Design a protein with these regions (language model features):
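Ligand-binding clefts/hinges and TM-proximal coupling segments of bilobed small-molecule sensing domains
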Residues: 33, 160-175, 211-216, 244-280
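Alpha-to-beta junction loops
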Residues: 44-45, 80-82, 99-107, 150-151, ...
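Extended ligand-binding regions for polar small-molecule ligands
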Residues: 70-78, 138-141, 145-146, 150-151, ...
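Extracytoplasmic small-molecule ligand-binding "clamshell" domains
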Residues: 31-108
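Periplasmic-binding protein-like
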Residues: 127-135, 197, 201, 205-244, ...
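Acidic, polar ligand-binding/catalytic clefts
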Residues: 73, 77, 82-146, 211-213, ...
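Short helix-initiation/N-cap motifs at beta->coil->alpha
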Residues: 69, 84-95, 157-159, 173-187, ...
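Bilobed "Venus flytrap"/periplasmic-binding protein-like clamshell domains
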Residues: 45-54, 64-77, 110, 130-180, ...
Length: 280
């Protein structure tokens, strides 16, 4: 009887320990808290854009590719784990990070104080971009002041929508993602599409757009882009910050811009100059 009780208790204790160990290892598709947990799981989960060529978009097979997925792949390689990319849009990317659906955001996230209050920003910022408007070549628009009272398609959640409306008097018509406002622009539902300049430059690499559209205005509202992890995830923060400095030291991001047909930005070149001779 005593032997049976001891055996039962031992089996119960083993089962409990096994359950605890299982709970301690994040499952695939569930964000991990810290570098060690990511290594245990064997996968780094990164939120990226899938409709933002050339920073994150789908190839003909449906695979997400682009400059930011390349950065994510480099981080996964440094960690020695596999990479899982989760598509996000401007309106849900921070929510996905807060809900633990992703470990890290590399998703054209402009650096704003209100965002730093709810996520852990990665410093230094990895990129910087202007705001611009994709317009038909026949629009006759040559100055931002001419946009007063004009309808502009926009992406929901973009921080500059209110600034453009308030400063220049444009009427903002917001859509989810970037494909819907681009479609609306082609349908004539708005005069132009206000968005990140680099993405609009990417669209003009496509024959479908460069024939009839252009960026006649000077870019405004220059804003750095930041990567982000969940608040309190200090080990992943440190790892990504060290990698970012290494990218700047080696010129990796400048090379990525060239790879994806982007004219290297003044920011990328300046950060490479700043870090290329750094010793740590």
């Amino acid at each position: 009887m005593r032997h049976t009780i001891r055996t039962t208790l031992a089996a119960g204790a083993l089962a409990a320990l096994t359950a605890l160990a299982t709970l301690a290892i994040p499952s695939r598709g569930e964000a991990a808290d810290g570098v060690d947990a990511i290594k245990q799981r064997g996968t780094l989960i990164v939120g990226v854009k899938a409709d933002y060529k050339p920073f994150g978009f789908r190839d003909p097979s449906g695979t997400i590719i682009g400059l930011e997925p390349d950065l994510a792949a480099d981080l996964a390689k440094r960690l020695g784990v596999k990479l899982e990319l989760v598509p996000v849009v401007s309106a849900n990317r921070i929510e996905f990070l807060q809900q633990g659906k992703v470990d890290l955001l590399i998703a054209t996230l402009s650096d704003k104080p209100e965002r730093r209050r709810v996520v852990q920003a990665i410093d230094p910022q990895y990129y910087s971009d202007f705001v611009n408007v994709l317009l038909p070549k026949t629009s006759g628009i040559t100055d931002w002041a001419q946009l007063k009272g004009k309808p502009l398609c926009a992406t929901s959640g973009a921080w500059y929508n209110k600034d453009v409306a308030r400063t220049y008097g444009a009427e903002i018509i917001a859509f989810d993602g970037s494909e819907k406002p681009l479609f609306a622009l082609k349908q004539g539902n708005c005069l132009g599409y206000v968005y990140d300049q680099s993405m609009l430059q990417g669209k003009l690499l496509d024959d479908d757009w460069k024939a009839g559209y252009a960026l006649p205005l000077k870019g405004i509202l220059d804003a750095p882009w930041m990567m982000a992890v969940a608040q309190g995830n200090a080990t992943l923060q440190a790892m990504v910050e060290n990698a970012t400095k290494d990218w700047m030291k080696t010129g990796f991001i400048v090379d990525e811009e060239k790879k994806w047909g982007i004219e290297p930005t003044a920011y990328s070149k300046a950060m490479h100059e700043k870090y290329k001779n750094a010793t740590n």
